[in-house]
Amino acid sequence: MTMRASLAIENFLEMMSAERGAAQNTLESYRRDLEAAAEELAAKGVNLAEAETGHIRMTLDTMAAQGFAPTSQARRLSALRQFFRFLYSEGFRQDDPTGILDAPKKQKPLPKIMSVENVGRLLDRAALEANEAAEPGERIKALRLHALLETLYATGLRVSELVGLPVTVARTDHRFLLVRGKGSKDRMVPLSRKARDALQKFLTLRDSLPGSDDNPWLFPAFSESGHLARQVFARELKGLAARAGLAASSVSPHVLRHAFASHLLQNGADLRTVQQLLGHADISTTQIYTHVLEERLHKLVSEHHPLAD
């Protein structure tokens, strides 16, 4: 039995209100999405209540072409799913045309990126505190934090990879770290001179502590067994950021990992190399940084093209 789109929408909204107790805002949102889809399809001679999968996909494609966010497209599809399930359950349709449609993928937010200047301020503050700490307990923690930061910014390690480094990696070739990442995949990452120096200063003091010979971790937790917890590192990092005059809320181990990748790309590294250094199994994961490449290419053309504005 065929039903006009407008009547079908009213019946659906009445059911949502009476049987499911949907809030007024929810009902209005459903109405807007369903009426917009009905109007678009009517202009093409299609009754929304009789629409097929291709028609529904077309309305979503139109939204995308008009610049609607994936969240708006997903909301529209959700309303249509509820609508067609209602028609199916009431016997007005023999199928649900939305059943095989996937929700539009949400765009990954661009990572927060610290400027080179702010990373420098953070590292300088860590170095200052490592040099000035006099009390033994404070000195070892300050040296550890400085070594952690220099290593993180030099390598872009995941925080779990960083705090879980075995001490043996610092006793072999000091120019590289052998890192075991996700899926137990190993990769070699180079160390900067500053990172090697900070690690060596920390390691010298670490090795002088009682029981250090039996501790397998490069960055041990001094108050308990095991390695430094990533939550403790994140907390110490935020405290350091505040002392360096930076907004603590904008600084985290993950933000520094993003800074490592972005600063490499800004200075000429290619995406494939950055993928290998970050330990991404798929290049698509690294492509969140393509905006950095686009900015670099735009700048390159602007500076070197003879007819650029």
Curated annotation (Swiss-Prot):
The keyword RNA-binding does not apply. HAMAP family: Recomb_XerC_XerD, Recomb_XerD. Residues 3-88 form the Core-binding (CB) domain. GO terms for molecular function: DNA binding; tyrosine-based site-specific recombinase activity. Its main location: cytoplasm. Gene3D superfamilies: 1.10.150.130, Intergrase catalytic core. It holds the Pfam family Phage_int_SAM_1. It comes from Brucella suis biovar 1 (strain 1330). GO terms for cellular component: cytoplasm. The active site is at residues 158, 182, 254, 257, 280, 289. Site-specific tyrosine recombinase, which acts by catalyzing the cutting and rejoining of the recombining DNA molecules. The XerC-XerD complex is essential to convert dimers of the bacterial chromosome into monomers to permit their segregation at cell division. It also contributes to the segregational stability of plasmids. The gene is xerD. It is found in: Cytoplasm. Belongs to the 'phage' integrase family. XerD subfamily. Keywords: Cell cycle, Cell division, Chromosome partition, Cytoplasm, DNA integration, DNA recombination, DNA-binding. The keyword Cell cycle applies. This is Tyrosine recombinase XerD. Residues 109-302 form the Tyr recombinase domain. GO terms for biological process: cell division; chromosome segregation; DNA transposition. Forms a cyclic heterotetrameric complex composed of two molecules of XerC and two molecules of XerD.
